[in-house]
A protein has these predicted regions:
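Juxtamembrane transmembrane-helix boundary motif
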Residues: 1-19, 33-39, 44, 65-151, ...
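Membrane-interface alpha-helices at helix entry/exit sites of multi-pass transporters
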Residues: 42-50, 75-76, 173-184
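Transmembrane helix boundary and interhelical junction motifs in multipass membrane proteins
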Residues: 23-32, 157-167
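Transmembrane helix-bundle signature of multi-pass membrane transporters/permeases
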Residues: 18, 48-56, 180-191, 244
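A small-residue-rich subset of transmembrane alpha-helices
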Residues: 54, 182-198, 208-221
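Hydrophobic, membrane-facing alpha-helical anchors
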Residues: 1-6, 10, 53-64, 159-168
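Short, structured loop/turn "capping" segments at alpha-beta junctions
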Residues: 126-127, 158-163, 174-178
Length: 258
């Protein structure tokens, strides 16, 4: 019973996380952590570590899929990533000094709101419009936004993907596919940094649960990324919005349960 229950929980956690990653560049931590904590009674710090490591491969595969379809801004992604990484470490250290109950609620609510935004006000920016911004201005914007995202990411251990998507589409004016592609590209590295630091501070995870989460998240992220790159902008906005709203509601439900 226990084994089957663990597989079922990790399957659905991985499915939610993978779809969120492939469609919206959402951090797997937002879905996997609450499920592992609520149903498997796992230590919150360890659950976030497992979720972040599930994120690494899922984001890498998604980023590769977006890159293959020319929907990835590597240059500005690298600039933003540098500032995100530095401040994720700062945020993570601050978080290890505060009680873990404060984490998570904020990012879940944001996921839900962002989902509604994509359904009600789709991002219809085109690649042509994106070219209109000067390289220097975009680089500076990338650094400033990266600092903000990194600190909040490290502190909450989630919400980074959502914040990145919000900032890339709203502040930096990216077209949706490029925003998601760039977001998952950055997240591959931020999740890796986060996972390694979590395991170094908190010790090794339950390897069985870890392996299941990694495999299931990877599988669903690949499916979602392939679909997202083939879809037209309107359909993609709607699909992304629905995935985010459903995940937001489900996770809020878990938080109430626990």
């Amino acid at each position: 019973m226990n084994l089957l229950f663990t597989i079922v929980v990790t399957f659905f956690a991985g499915m939610g996380a993978g779809l969120g990653t492939g469609f919206a560049g959402m951090s797997a931590a937002a879905v996997i952590s609450p499920m592992l904590i609520t149903f498997l009674g796992m230590d919150p710090y360890m659950a976030v570590g497992i979720a972040l490591s599930s994120d690494v491969l899922a984001s890498a595969v998604s980023a590769f899929t977006y890159h293959k379809n020319k929907n990835l801004d590597i240059k500005n992604g690298l600039i933003m990533m540098a500032s995100v990484l530095v401040f994720t470490v700062v945020g993570s250290w601050v978080a290890s000094r505060v009680p873990s109950a404060t984490m998570g609620g904020f990012s879940v609510f944001m996921t839900f709101l962002l989902g509604i935004k994509f359904i009600v006000r789709p991002v219809m920016t085109t690649k042509e419009a994106m070219q209109g911004v000067s390289a220097k201005k975009r680089a500076i914007q990338s650094i400033v936004c990266g600092v903000l995202i990194g600190f909040i990411c490290g502190f909450i251990g989630a919400g980074g993907g959502m914040m990145m998507l919000l900032i890339l589409t709203s502040v930096l004016g990216y077209e949706l596919k490029t925003a998601v592609g760039t977001s998952v590209f950055i997240m591959t590295f931020t999740a890796l940094t986060g996972a390694v630091s979590h395991f170094m501070i908190g010790g090794a995870p339950n390897w069985f649960v870890w392996a299941l989460c990694v495999v299931f998240t990877l599988l669903w992220a690949r499916i979602a990324a392939v679909f997202a790159n083939k879809a037209d902008p309107k359909t993609l906005n709607r699909a992304t919005g629905i995935v985010l709203v459903v995940l937001g509601v489900v996770i809020m439900g878990f938080n109430l349960l626990s």
